Design a protein with these regions (language model features):
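Short helix-loop-beta-strand segments that form the rim/entrance of peptidase-like active sites
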Residues: 72, 338-364
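Soluble metallo-hydrolase cores and metallopeptidase-like ectodomains found primarily
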Residues: 54-56, 129-132, 143-176, 243-323, ...
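N-terminal capping segment at the start of a domain
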Residues: 47-88, 114, 238-243, 315, ...
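Extracellular/luminal Protease-associated
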Residues: 88, 140-254, 321, 422
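Metal-dependent peptidase/peptidase-like ectodomains
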Residues: 65, 103, 133, 155, ...
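Noncatalytic luminal/extracellular "stalk/propeptide" segments of secretory-pathway proteins
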Residues: 36, 42-53, 75, 79-196
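Second-shell loop/turn segments in exported
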Residues: 57-65, 79-89, 160-165, 174, ...
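His/Asp/Glu-rich mid-to-C-terminal helical/loop segments that flank catalytic regions of hydrolases
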Residues: 338, 342, 349, 454-495
Protein backbone atom coordinates (compact mmCIF):
# COMPACT_ATOMS: atom_id res chain seq x y z
CA UNK A 1 0.00 0.00 0.00
CA UNK A 2 1.21 3.51 -0.79
CA UNK A 3 0.79 5.39 2.45
CA UNK A 4 -0.39 9.02 2.72
CA UNK A 5 2.30 11.61 2.11
CA UNK A 6 4.49 12.68 5.04
CA UNK A 7 2.56 15.89 5.63
CA UNK A 8 -0.48 13.79 6.41
CA UNK A 9 1.11 12.45 9.56
CA UNK A 10 0.44 14.11 12.89
CA UNK A 11 1.64 13.26 16.40
CA UNK A 12 -0.48 10.77 18.31
CA UNK A 13 -1.61 13.49 20.68
CA UNK A 14 -2.91 15.66 17.83
CA UNK A 15 -5.13 18.56 18.79
CA UNK A 16 -8.75 18.78 17.72
CA UNK A 17 -9.46 22.10 15.98
CA UNK A 18 -12.06 24.15 17.76
CA UNK A 19 -15.14 25.24 15.87
CA UNK A 20 -18.44 26.77 16.84
CA UNK A 21 -21.53 26.97 14.66
CA UNK A 22 -21.70 30.70 15.32
CA UNK A 23 -18.03 31.52 14.87
CA UNK A 24 -18.71 34.09 12.17
CA UNK A 25 -21.09 35.96 14.41
CA UNK A 26 -18.70 35.81 17.38
CA UNK A 27 -16.00 37.32 15.22
CA UNK A 28 -18.04 40.49 14.62
CA UNK A 29 -16.98 43.58 16.58
CA UNK A 30 -19.30 44.60 19.44
CA UNK A 31 -22.07 47.02 18.44
CA UNK A 32 -23.50 49.83 20.59
CA UNK A 33 -26.77 48.96 22.31
CA UNK A 34 -28.56 51.77 20.53
CA UNK A 35 -28.12 52.83 16.94
CA UNK A 36 -29.88 55.30 14.73
CA UNK A 37 -30.07 52.66 12.01
CA UNK A 38 -30.60 48.94 12.63
CA UNK A 39 -27.52 46.78 12.17
CA UNK A 40 -27.69 44.34 9.30
CA UNK A 41 -28.51 40.81 10.47
CA UNK A 42 -25.56 38.47 10.09
CA UNK A 43 -26.15 35.76 7.54
CA UNK A 44 -27.13 32.45 9.07
CA UNK A 45 -24.39 29.86 9.39
CA UNK A 46 -25.17 27.07 6.93
CA UNK A 47 -26.44 23.88 8.55
CA UNK A 48 -24.72 20.80 7.17
CA UNK A 49 -25.93 18.13 9.58
CA UNK A 50 -29.50 18.00 10.84
CA UNK A 51 -30.17 16.98 14.44
CA UNK A 52 -31.63 13.67 13.27
CA UNK A 53 -28.47 12.94 11.26
CA UNK A 54 -26.29 13.63 14.30
CA UNK A 55 -28.46 11.28 16.35
CA UNK A 56 -28.02 8.60 13.68
CA UNK A 57 -24.24 9.13 13.76
CA UNK A 58 -24.20 8.36 17.47
CA UNK A 59 -26.22 5.21 16.82
CA UNK A 60 -23.75 4.16 14.13
CA UNK A 61 -20.80 4.75 16.45
CA UNK A 62 -22.30 2.59 19.19
CA UNK A 63 -23.44 -0.13 16.80
CA UNK A 64 -19.95 -0.33 15.28
CA UNK A 65 -18.41 -0.80 18.72
CA UNK A 66 -20.77 -3.71 19.39
CA UNK A 67 -20.41 -5.43 16.01
CA UNK A 68 -18.12 -8.34 15.15
CA UNK A 69 -19.07 -8.26 11.45
CA UNK A 70 -15.87 -6.53 10.27
CA UNK A 71 -13.65 -8.90 12.23
CA UNK A 72 -15.44 -11.94 10.82
CA UNK A 73 -14.93 -10.56 7.31
CA UNK A 74 -11.21 -9.88 7.67
CA UNK A 75 -10.76 -13.24 9.40
CA UNK A 76 -12.32 -15.02 6.43
CA UNK A 77 -10.23 -13.07 3.93
CA UNK A 78 -6.98 -13.65 5.80
CA UNK A 79 -7.45 -17.16 7.18
CA UNK A 80 -9.96 -18.93 4.95
CA UNK A 81 -8.82 -17.43 1.64
CA UNK A 82 -5.29 -16.32 2.47
CA UNK A 83 -2.81 -14.26 0.40
CA UNK A 84 -4.59 -12.53 -2.48
CA UNK A 85 -1.90 -11.48 -4.93
CA UNK A 86 -3.43 -10.09 -8.10
CA UNK A 87 -3.99 -12.83 -10.67
CA UNK A 88 -4.02 -15.64 -8.11
CA UNK A 89 -6.86 -18.08 -7.48
CA UNK A 90 -7.16 -16.62 -3.97
CA UNK A 91 -7.75 -13.14 -5.40
CA UNK A 92 -10.47 -14.53 -7.66
CA UNK A 93 -12.05 -16.35 -4.70
CA UNK A 94 -12.00 -13.15 -2.65
CA UNK A 95 -13.91 -11.28 -5.37
CA UNK A 96 -16.62 -13.96 -5.32
CA UNK A 97 -16.75 -13.99 -1.53
CA UNK A 98 -17.07 -10.23 -1.02
CA UNK A 99 -19.67 -9.96 -3.79
CA UNK A 100 -21.80 -12.66 -2.12
CA UNK A 101 -21.48 -11.05 1.32
CA UNK A 102 -22.54 -7.55 0.28
CA UNK A 103 -25.32 -9.03 -1.85
CA UNK A 104 -26.60 -10.71 1.31
CA UNK A 105 -26.83 -7.25 2.90
CA UNK A 106 -29.26 -6.18 0.19
CA UNK A 107 -26.82 -4.05 -1.78
CA UNK A 108 -26.99 -3.65 -5.55
CA UNK A 109 -23.80 -5.44 -6.60
CA UNK A 110 -21.77 -5.19 -9.78
CA UNK A 111 -18.49 -6.83 -10.72
CA UNK A 112 -16.68 -4.33 -12.90
CA UNK A 113 -14.14 -6.24 -14.97
CA UNK A 114 -10.49 -5.28 -15.24
CA UNK A 115 -7.44 -6.97 -16.75
CA UNK A 116 -4.70 -7.28 -14.15
CA UNK A 117 -1.04 -8.37 -14.07
CA UNK A 118 -0.11 -11.87 -12.96
CA UNK A 119 3.33 -11.91 -11.37
CA UNK A 120 4.34 -14.97 -9.34
CA UNK A 121 7.19 -15.45 -6.91
CA UNK A 122 9.74 -18.21 -7.48
CA UNK A 123 12.97 -19.37 -5.88
CA UNK A 124 14.69 -16.58 -3.95
CA UNK A 125 18.02 -17.33 -2.30
CA UNK A 126 21.28 -15.53 -1.73
CA UNK A 127 24.56 -16.19 0.02
CA UNK A 128 27.84 -14.42 0.46
CA UNK A 129 30.47 -16.62 -1.13
CA UNK A 130 33.53 -14.44 -0.55
CA UNK A 131 34.08 -11.88 2.20
CA UNK A 132 36.81 -10.58 4.54
CA UNK A 133 37.70 -12.95 7.39
CA UNK A 134 35.87 -15.86 5.80
CA UNK A 135 36.50 -19.31 7.23
CA UNK A 136 37.53 -21.77 4.55
CA UNK A 137 34.66 -23.59 2.89
CA UNK A 138 31.90 -21.41 4.41
CA UNK A 139 29.29 -19.01 3.10
CA UNK A 140 26.83 -16.66 4.77
CA UNK A 141 23.12 -16.93 4.03
CA UNK A 142 21.26 -13.71 3.14
CA UNK A 143 17.53 -13.47 3.86
CA UNK A 144 15.60 -11.66 1.14
CA UNK A 145 12.51 -11.64 -1.05
CA UNK A 146 11.99 -10.57 -4.64
CA UNK A 147 10.34 -7.20 -5.19
CA UNK A 148 7.01 -7.23 -6.97
CA UNK A 149 7.42 -7.15 -10.73
CA UNK A 150 11.07 -8.18 -10.58
CA UNK A 151 12.59 -10.01 -13.49
CA UNK A 152 14.51 -13.22 -12.84
CA UNK A 153 18.16 -14.07 -12.74
CA UNK A 154 19.34 -16.94 -14.93
CA UNK A 155 18.27 -20.26 -13.35
CA UNK A 156 21.80 -20.81 -12.07
CA UNK A 157 21.84 -17.32 -10.55
CA UNK A 158 24.28 -14.41 -10.60
CA UNK A 159 27.73 -14.31 -9.02
CA UNK A 160 28.93 -10.75 -8.51
CA UNK A 161 30.65 -8.37 -6.14
CA UNK A 162 28.46 -6.13 -4.00
CA UNK A 163 28.50 -2.34 -3.90
CA UNK A 164 26.81 -0.63 -0.94
CA UNK A 165 25.44 2.91 -1.04
CA UNK A 166 23.20 4.79 1.36
CA UNK A 167 21.30 6.85 -1.19
CA UNK A 168 20.99 7.95 -4.81
CA UNK A 169 23.65 10.65 -4.35
CA UNK A 170 26.26 8.11 -3.28
CA UNK A 171 25.42 5.93 -6.27
CA UNK A 172 25.67 8.83 -8.71
CA UNK A 173 29.06 9.77 -7.29
CA UNK A 174 30.51 6.39 -8.29
CA UNK A 175 32.16 5.95 -11.69
CA UNK A 176 30.37 3.49 -13.94
CA UNK A 177 33.20 0.93 -13.72
CA UNK A 178 32.64 0.66 -9.95
CA UNK A 179 29.01 -0.39 -10.53
CA UNK A 180 29.00 -2.20 -13.87
CA UNK A 181 28.31 -5.92 -13.48
CA UNK A 182 27.93 -5.71 -9.71
CA UNK A 183 25.04 -6.15 -7.25
CA UNK A 184 24.09 -2.77 -5.79
CA UNK A 185 22.65 -2.55 -2.27
CA UNK A 186 20.76 0.60 -1.23
CA UNK A 187 21.26 0.56 2.54
CA UNK A 188 18.83 3.35 3.44
CA UNK A 189 17.32 2.81 6.89
CA UNK A 190 13.64 3.06 7.77
CA UNK A 191 13.54 5.70 10.52
CA UNK A 192 12.18 3.80 13.52
CA UNK A 193 12.46 6.83 15.79
CA UNK A 194 9.98 8.98 13.92
CA UNK A 195 7.76 5.94 13.36
CA UNK A 196 7.70 5.41 17.15
CA UNK A 197 6.46 8.99 17.50
CA UNK A 198 3.44 8.21 15.34
CA UNK A 199 4.95 9.29 12.02
CA UNK A 200 5.16 5.88 10.36
CA UNK A 201 3.99 7.24 7.04
CA UNK A 202 6.77 9.81 6.99
CA UNK A 203 9.40 7.16 7.68
CA UNK A 204 7.94 5.01 4.92
CA UNK A 205 7.85 7.89 2.46
CA UNK A 206 11.53 8.64 3.02
CA UNK A 207 12.64 5.05 2.37
CA UNK A 208 10.20 3.68 -0.22
CA UNK A 209 11.75 5.64 -3.09
CA UNK A 210 14.68 3.22 -3.04
CA UNK A 211 12.35 0.27 -3.51
CA UNK A 212 10.44 1.91 -6.35
CA UNK A 213 13.31 3.66 -8.16
CA UNK A 214 16.50 2.00 -6.92
CA UNK A 215 16.69 -0.80 -9.51
CA UNK A 216 16.36 1.66 -12.39
CA UNK A 217 19.06 3.92 -10.93
CA UNK A 218 21.41 0.95 -10.52
CA UNK A 219 20.65 -0.41 -13.99
CA UNK A 220 21.57 2.92 -15.58
CA UNK A 221 25.13 2.37 -14.34
CA UNK A 222 25.26 -1.22 -15.54
CA UNK A 223 24.47 -3.09 -12.31
CA UNK A 224 23.69 -6.80 -12.65
CA UNK A 225 21.08 -6.73 -9.87
CA UNK A 226 19.75 -4.44 -7.15
CA UNK A 227 19.02 -5.05 -3.49
CA UNK A 228 17.29 -2.62 -1.17
CA UNK A 229 17.17 -2.56 2.59
CA UNK A 230 13.62 -3.57 3.54
CA UNK A 231 11.25 -0.62 3.81
CA UNK A 232 9.78 -1.09 7.27
CA UNK A 233 10.50 -1.61 10.93
CA UNK A 234 10.49 -5.41 11.17
CA UNK A 235 12.93 -7.09 13.50
CA UNK A 236 13.75 -10.81 13.64
CA UNK A 237 15.29 -10.88 10.14
CA UNK A 238 11.99 -10.53 8.25
CA UNK A 239 12.01 -8.99 4.73
CA UNK A 240 9.42 -6.54 3.39
CA UNK A 241 8.32 -6.94 -0.22
CA UNK A 242 6.64 -4.31 -2.41
CA UNK A 243 6.45 -3.18 -6.00
CA UNK A 244 9.38 -1.83 -7.96
CA UNK A 245 8.99 0.24 -11.12
CA UNK A 246 10.98 -0.38 -14.28
CA UNK A 247 11.26 2.24 -17.02
CA UNK A 248 11.22 1.91 -20.77
CA UNK A 249 14.67 2.21 -22.26
CA UNK A 250 16.44 1.09 -19.07
CA UNK A 251 17.54 -2.55 -18.69
CA UNK A 252 15.39 -4.54 -16.26
CA UNK A 253 17.58 -6.11 -13.60
CA UNK A 254 16.59 -8.54 -10.82
CA UNK A 255 15.52 -6.73 -7.65
CA UNK A 256 15.01 -7.90 -4.08
CA UNK A 257 14.62 -6.61 -0.54
CA UNK A 258 17.01 -7.88 2.13
CA UNK A 259 16.24 -7.76 5.83
CA UNK A 260 17.62 -4.86 7.86
CA UNK A 261 19.98 -7.26 9.61
CA UNK A 262 21.30 -8.63 6.32
CA UNK A 263 21.72 -5.13 4.89
CA UNK A 264 23.89 -4.26 7.88
CA UNK A 265 25.88 -7.49 7.46
CA UNK A 266 26.60 -6.86 3.78
CA UNK A 267 27.54 -3.22 4.42
CA UNK A 268 29.85 -4.19 7.29
CA UNK A 269 31.73 -6.76 5.24
CA UNK A 270 31.83 -4.69 2.04
CA UNK A 271 33.42 -1.83 3.98
CA UNK A 272 36.29 -4.20 4.88
CA UNK A 273 36.91 -5.53 1.40
CA UNK A 274 35.63 -7.49 -1.56
CA UNK A 275 32.29 -9.15 -0.77
CA UNK A 276 30.85 -11.46 -3.38
CA UNK A 277 27.29 -12.81 -3.60
CA UNK A 278 25.47 -15.64 -5.34
CA UNK A 279 21.88 -14.52 -6.03
CA UNK A 280 19.02 -16.62 -7.41
CA UNK A 281 15.60 -15.09 -8.15
CA UNK A 282 13.13 -16.90 -10.43
CA UNK A 283 9.86 -14.93 -10.44
CA UNK A 284 7.69 -14.94 -13.55
CA UNK A 285 5.39 -12.42 -15.19
CA UNK A 286 2.56 -14.43 -16.73
CA UNK A 287 -0.14 -13.15 -19.14
CA UNK A 288 -2.68 -10.71 -17.72
CA UNK A 289 -5.85 -12.23 -16.30
CA UNK A 290 -9.40 -10.94 -15.90
CA UNK A 291 -10.46 -9.84 -12.43
CA UNK A 292 -12.91 -7.29 -11.04
CA UNK A 293 -13.62 -4.48 -8.63
CA UNK A 294 -16.56 -5.33 -6.39
CA UNK A 295 -19.09 -2.45 -6.42
CA UNK A 296 -21.99 -2.53 -3.94
CA UNK A 297 -24.55 0.27 -3.65
CA UNK A 298 -27.10 1.26 -1.05
CA UNK A 299 -29.21 3.60 -3.17
CA UNK A 300 -29.83 7.09 -1.85
CA UNK A 301 -33.41 7.99 -0.96
CA UNK A 302 -33.26 11.59 -2.26
CA UNK A 303 -30.14 11.93 -4.43
CA UNK A 304 -29.35 8.42 -5.70
CA UNK A 305 -27.13 9.84 -8.44
CA UNK A 306 -24.80 11.35 -5.81
CA UNK A 307 -22.30 8.81 -4.48
CA UNK A 308 -20.31 8.48 -1.27
CA UNK A 309 -17.60 5.81 -1.60
CA UNK A 310 -16.18 3.69 1.22
CA UNK A 311 -13.40 1.38 0.10
CA UNK A 312 -10.36 -0.79 0.66
CA UNK A 313 -8.26 -2.94 -1.65
CA UNK A 314 -8.93 -6.66 -1.89
CA UNK A 315 -5.59 -7.81 -3.29
CA UNK A 316 -2.60 -8.33 -1.02
CA UNK A 317 1.03 -9.34 -1.19
CA UNK A 318 1.76 -13.04 -1.07
CA UNK A 319 4.14 -13.34 1.87
CA UNK A 320 1.53 -12.85 4.60
CA UNK A 321 -2.24 -13.27 4.53
CA UNK A 322 -3.17 -9.64 3.87
CA UNK A 323 -4.97 -8.99 7.15
CA UNK A 324 -3.80 -5.46 7.85
CA UNK A 325 -3.02 -4.67 4.20
CA UNK A 326 -5.75 -4.52 3.28
CA UNK A 327 -8.30 -7.06 4.43
CA UNK A 328 -9.05 -4.68 7.28
CA UNK A 329 -9.89 -1.83 4.91
CA UNK A 330 -12.28 -3.99 2.88
CA UNK A 331 -13.91 -5.27 6.08
CA UNK A 332 -14.39 -1.74 7.42
CA UNK A 333 -16.03 -0.65 4.16
CA UNK A 334 -18.34 -3.68 4.25
CA UNK A 335 -19.18 -2.89 7.87
CA UNK A 336 -20.50 0.53 6.84
CA UNK A 337 -23.11 -1.13 4.63
CA UNK A 338 -23.85 -3.71 7.32
CA UNK A 339 -24.47 -1.05 9.99
CA UNK A 340 -26.66 1.09 7.76
CA UNK A 341 -28.80 -1.95 7.00
CA UNK A 342 -28.83 -3.15 10.60
CA UNK A 343 -30.09 0.21 11.88
CA UNK A 344 -32.59 0.56 8.99
CA UNK A 345 -31.13 3.93 8.04
CA UNK A 346 -31.95 5.60 4.74
CA UNK A 347 -29.05 7.65 3.40
CA UNK A 348 -30.07 10.53 1.16
CA UNK A 349 -27.17 9.82 -1.16
CA UNK A 350 -25.94 6.48 -2.45
CA UNK A 351 -23.35 4.78 -0.26
CA UNK A 352 -21.05 2.74 -2.48
CA UNK A 353 -18.77 0.04 -1.09
CA UNK A 354 -15.80 -0.76 -3.34
CA UNK A 355 -13.30 -3.59 -2.93
CA UNK A 356 -10.52 -2.55 -5.30
CA UNK A 357 -8.40 -5.02 -7.21
CA UNK A 358 -4.67 -4.62 -7.89
CA UNK A 359 -3.68 -1.74 -5.66
CA UNK A 360 -0.41 -3.37 -4.69
CA UNK A 361 1.21 -3.91 -8.07
CA UNK A 362 -0.41 -1.75 -10.67
CA UNK A 363 -3.60 0.01 -9.47
CA UNK A 364 -5.36 -1.34 -12.54
CA UNK A 365 -8.69 -1.57 -10.70
CA UNK A 366 -8.80 2.08 -9.70
CA UNK A 367 -7.54 3.19 -13.11
CA UNK A 368 -10.30 1.20 -14.79
CA UNK A 369 -12.91 2.69 -12.46
CA UNK A 370 -11.64 6.19 -13.25
CA UNK A 371 -11.86 5.45 -16.97
CA UNK A 372 -15.38 4.02 -16.71
CA UNK A 373 -16.81 6.59 -14.28
CA UNK A 374 -14.93 9.83 -15.01
CA UNK A 375 -18.07 11.45 -16.40
CA UNK A 376 -19.77 10.80 -13.03
CA UNK A 377 -17.10 12.35 -10.81
CA UNK A 378 -19.09 15.57 -10.51
CA UNK A 379 -21.68 13.48 -8.67
CA UNK A 380 -19.13 11.65 -6.53
CA UNK A 381 -19.93 13.50 -3.32
CA UNK A 382 -17.06 12.20 -1.16
CA UNK A 383 -14.66 9.25 -1.24
CA UNK A 384 -12.92 7.15 1.38
CA UNK A 385 -10.13 4.62 1.29
CA UNK A 386 -8.97 2.76 4.38
CA UNK A 387 -5.49 1.38 3.68
CA UNK A 388 -3.41 1.94 6.78
CA UNK A 389 -4.11 -1.15 8.84
CA UNK A 390 -6.45 -1.41 11.80
CA UNK A 391 -4.64 0.25 14.69
CA UNK A 392 -6.46 2.73 16.94
CA UNK A 393 -7.79 5.71 14.95
CA UNK A 394 -7.18 9.15 16.43
CA UNK A 395 -9.33 10.99 13.91
CA UNK A 396 -9.84 11.70 10.24
CA UNK A 397 -7.50 12.71 7.45
CA UNK A 398 -9.30 15.03 5.03
CA UNK A 399 -8.22 16.05 1.54
CA UNK A 400 -10.61 18.90 0.91
CA UNK A 401 -11.02 22.65 1.09
CA UNK A 402 -9.98 24.06 4.49
CA UNK A 403 -13.59 24.92 5.32
CA UNK A 404 -14.50 21.22 5.19
CA UNK A 405 -12.48 20.77 8.37
CA UNK A 406 -14.81 23.19 10.11
CA UNK A 407 -17.87 21.55 8.59
CA UNK A 408 -16.73 18.20 10.04
CA UNK A 409 -16.43 19.49 13.62
CA UNK A 410 -19.84 18.12 14.73
CA UNK A 411 -18.75 14.74 13.36
CA UNK A 412 -15.42 15.02 15.20
CA UNK A 413 -17.22 15.67 18.48
CA UNK A 414 -19.14 12.42 18.08
CA UNK A 415 -15.95 10.53 17.27
CA UNK A 416 -14.08 12.10 20.18
CA UNK A 417 -16.03 9.73 22.44
CA UNK A 418 -13.75 6.95 21.14
CA UNK A 419 -10.62 9.12 21.03
CA UNK A 420 -10.93 9.78 17.31
CA UNK A 421 -11.82 13.46 17.20
CA UNK A 422 -8.72 14.89 15.52
CA UNK A 423 -9.19 16.42 12.07
CA UNK A 424 -6.18 16.78 9.78
CA UNK A 425 -6.01 18.36 6.33
CA UNK A 426 -3.92 16.07 4.12
CA UNK A 427 -2.34 16.28 0.70
CA UNK A 428 -3.23 12.71 -0.26
CA UNK A 429 -5.53 10.00 1.10
CA UNK A 430 -5.25 6.79 -0.90
CA UNK A 431 -3.81 5.31 -4.09
CA UNK A 432 -7.09 3.87 -5.36
CA UNK A 433 -9.06 7.07 -4.90
CA UNK A 434 -6.31 9.34 -6.24
CA UNK A 435 -8.05 9.92 -9.62
CA UNK A 436 -11.08 11.23 -7.74
CA UNK A 437 -8.91 13.30 -5.40
CA UNK A 438 -7.34 14.93 -8.47
CA UNK A 439 -10.82 15.65 -9.81
CA UNK A 440 -11.57 17.62 -6.64
CA UNK A 441 -13.79 15.08 -4.87
CA UNK A 442 -13.47 15.53 -1.08
CA UNK A 443 -11.68 12.52 0.41
CA UNK A 444 -11.26 11.08 3.89
CA UNK A 445 -9.68 8.19 5.76
CA UNK A 446 -9.10 7.16 9.37
CA UNK A 447 -5.98 8.75 10.84
CA UNK A 448 -4.41 5.81 12.62
CA UNK A 449 -1.73 5.16 15.17
CA UNK A 450 1.06 4.17 12.78
CA UNK A 451 3.75 3.26 15.31
CA UNK A 452 3.59 -0.48 14.61
CA UNK A 453 1.96 -0.86 11.19
CA UNK A 454 5.23 -0.83 9.25
CA UNK A 455 6.69 -3.59 11.41
CA UNK A 456 4.36 -5.98 9.58
CA UNK A 457 3.60 -4.18 6.31
CA UNK A 458 4.36 -6.34 3.23
CA UNK A 459 5.93 -9.10 5.37
CA UNK A 460 5.05 -12.71 6.23
CA UNK A 461 3.86 -11.30 9.57
CA UNK A 462 0.84 -9.52 8.04
CA UNK A 463 -1.56 -11.97 9.65
CA UNK A 464 -4.86 -11.87 11.52
CA UNK A 465 -3.31 -11.84 15.00
CA UNK A 466 -2.02 -8.31 14.32
CA UNK A 467 -5.59 -6.99 14.35
CA UNK A 468 -7.06 -5.99 17.72
CA UNK A 469 -10.84 -6.51 17.39
CA UNK A 470 -11.69 -3.41 19.45
CA UNK A 471 -9.46 -1.19 17.33
CA UNK A 472 -10.98 -2.60 14.15
CA UNK A 473 -14.40 -1.69 15.57
CA UNK A 474 -13.14 1.85 16.21
CA UNK A 475 -11.99 2.17 12.60
CA UNK A 476 -15.36 0.89 11.43
CA UNK A 477 -17.05 3.50 13.60
CA UNK A 478 -14.94 6.32 12.15
CA UNK A 479 -15.62 5.34 8.55
CA UNK A 480 -19.33 4.60 9.01
CA UNK A 481 -19.94 7.84 10.91
CA UNK A 482 -18.04 10.00 8.41
CA UNK A 483 -19.61 8.31 5.39
CA UNK A 484 -23.16 8.54 6.68
CA UNK A 485 -22.60 12.16 7.72
CA UNK A 486 -21.71 13.25 4.20
CA UNK A 487 -24.34 10.98 2.66
CA UNK A 488 -26.97 12.86 4.68
CA UNK A 489 -25.44 16.34 4.61
CA UNK A 490 -27.93 19.12 3.98
CA UNK A 491 -25.63 20.80 1.46
CA UNK A 492 -22.82 19.93 -0.89
CA UNK A 493 -19.29 20.05 0.45
CA UNK A 494 -17.19 22.83 -1.08
CA UNK A 495 -14.76 21.81 -3.81
Amino acid sequence: MPFPSPKNQVPLLGLVSLFGASFSALAQPAQPEASLTPAASPSATPIFFADQTLAHLKQLRQAALASDYAFKQVAHLANNIGPRLTGSVQAAKAVEYVADEVKALGCDVQLEKVMVPHWVRGVETAELTQFPGQAAGTTQKIVLCALGGSVSTPPEGINADTVCVRDFEELKALPREKVNGKIVLFNHSFDKKIAAQGHGGEAYGQAVVYRSDGPVAAAKLGAAACLIRSVGGADYRIPHTGQTNYKDGVPKIPAAAVTAEDADLIAYLAAQGETRMHLVLTPQTLPDVESANVIADIKGSEHPEQVVIVSGHLDSWDLGTGAIDDGAGVAVAMETAHLVRQLHLKPKRTIRVIAWMNEENGSRGSKQYAKDHASEFANHFAVNETDGGADHPIGLNLKAKPEVKEIFEPVAKILQEIGAGTLNLSEHIGADIEPMEKAGVPAFSPMQDSRFYFNYHHTPADTLDKIVPRELQENAAVVAVAAYAVANAEQSLPR
